[in-house]
Amino acid sequence: MHIIETQDLCHTYKGNIDALKNISFIAPRNTRIAIIGPNGAGKSTLFKHFNGVLKPTSGKVLIRGEPITKENIREVRRTVGLVFQNPDDQIFSPTVEQDVAFGPINMGLDEEAVKHRVSEALRTVGLSEYRTRVPHHLSGGEKKRVAIAGIIAMEPQVLVLDEPTAGLDPQGVREIIRFIRDFSVRYGMTVIFSTHNISLVAELAEYIYVMNNGSFVAEGTVAEIFSQPDLLSSVRLDLPILPKLISSLRSKGIAIDMGYTYQEAEIAFLKAFGKIA
C-alpha cells in the first residue's frame, strides 16, 4: 500500500479550465519524488489534492489506501504536510514560535508536547535562536524555513514542497537541500517536491514525474529522465550543466562515465583523466 496514490485524477476550474487530466501517481513510503514541468503544468494544483485542500472533479486520491473524506480530513492533514511556494501564504502568527506551534496545538497536544515539537522543528531547520522573531521581518529563505518547521512540527509521514528553492540565494538552496535529505533519512519521511531547479532534482530525487498541460508525459529514475534531453526541452527545461557537459564529451567519443550530481561528475572526470581507478 502506497502512502499516496491518485487514480485518474482530474480537476477542472471554473471556466472549464482542465488543470489535471487523468493523473495516476504513486508515492511509496520513504522516497524522494520530484515533479517537474513548466509554469502552468498543474503541479501546484496536484499538490493541493494530496492533503485535501482541493477536491477532485473526478478520479481518486488515496492516502494510505483510503479516500479523503470529511471524516478523515484532519488525519490526512496530519499525515501529509504541504508547504506552499510562497511562505507568506501560511505564516500568520506574531512570532516564529507561535507560528510553528499552531499545528501541534490544533492537534490537541499538551503544552509540554507542543514545546518539544516546536524546539525540535526549529532546531532541525536551524532557527532555534529565532523563537521570538516576527516572521514577516525575516528573509525569504528564513520564512521558508519557518513554514517548513510549522509542518514538520506536526510530524507528518509525507512532506510536500511546492518550489522549495524559489527565490532563494545559493546558500538558501544548499540549506534546503540539506533539510530535505535530513527529513527523508532521519525521519523516514516521504518527500515530494516540485522545482525548476533541475540540479536540485539530480541531487535529491529518487524518482521523477514530468508534467505538462495537466498530464504526466513521462516518469522514471534520474538516469532515465535525464538521458532524454529532447523530453526536457519539450517542457521548457534543460539538463544541469555537468551532465550536459559530460553528454557532449561522450558524443565526441571521449570515454567518460555519466554523472548527474556534482559528486558523480567529479568522480567521472577524475577517472577519465586517470586520477583514480
UniProtKB/Swiss-Prot annotation:
The keyword Membrane applies. It comes from the Archaea. SMART domains: AAA (SM00382). GO terms for molecular function: ATP binding; ATP hydrolysis activity; ATPase-coupled transmembrane transporter activity. Its main location: membrane. Residues 4-238 form the ABC transporter domain. Keywords: ATP-binding, Cell membrane, Membrane, Nucleotide-binding, Translocase, Transport. It is a peripheral membrane protein. InterPro entries: AAA+_ATPase, ABC_transporter-like_ATP-bd, ABC_transporter-like_CS, ABC_transpr_CbiO/EcfA_su, Co_trans_ATP-bd, ECF_ABC_transporter_ATP-bd, P-loop_NTPase. GO terms for biological process: cobalt ion transport. One of its GO terms (cellular component) is ATP-binding cassette (ABC) transporter complex. Its EC number is 7.-.-.-. It is found in: Cell membrane. ATP binds at residues 37-44. NCBIfam families: cbiO, PRK13652.1. Belongs to the ABC transporter superfamily. Energy-coupling factor EcfA family. Forms a stable energy-coupling factor (ECF) transporter complex composed of 2 membrane-embedded substrate-binding proteins (S component), 2 ATP-binding proteins (A component) and 2 transmembrane proteins (T component). ATP-binding (A) component of a common energy-coupling factor (ECF) ABC-transporter complex. Unlike classic ABC transporters this ECF transporter provides the energy necessary to transport a number of different substrates. This is Energy-coupling factor transporter ATP-binding protein EcfA1.
